[in-house]
Amino acid sequence: DVIPKDALITFANCDKNGSIVFDCDLPVGFKWYAKEIATDAHYILSDTKYEFDTEYQGQDIKVIDIKINNDKAIENNLIYGSVKGLKVDRETQEVIKGATFGLFKSDTTELTEENAILTAVTDENGIFTFSNIPYGEYLIKELKPADGYLDNEDVFTVTIKNNEQVVELTALNDKVPEL
């Protein structure tokens, strides 16, 4: 039988220590490669091919132990994204500088500055940014309004699912009423 180029011969899963053992019969004298075909959702799927060959070791050798990647650990890279928010006056649509926002784990119940993973203040363009956010679901809430504006109780849920993903949101705010 002929094995087609790039055909899947076998697959294996990592054990609890992160080790993988492929247990299959491969013909000797050929070049092969191992490649990641699935990973945990938190990680970037690698397209790296780890090449190796099977050389004849003599008739008394029944099993060949092959190490890939020069016997070094293969690292998986976490998915990271960012959040870019825009703070706008509800009535005038003008951008608002000086509002403080917090980023929280999705299971956080008290959305306070002390419990925030990160905080950011809107700049002169009304923009705040949270960078290098790992894969997952988060909450964003305004912690302190800009001068002259009312507290905003809106809570935004954002999800980072893809590497280098930018989640954009717009937060509206009302001015303190003039008496």
For each of these PLM feature ranges, what is it?
Residues 1-179:
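Solvent-exposed loop/turn and edge beta-strand elements of beta-rich ligand-binding domains
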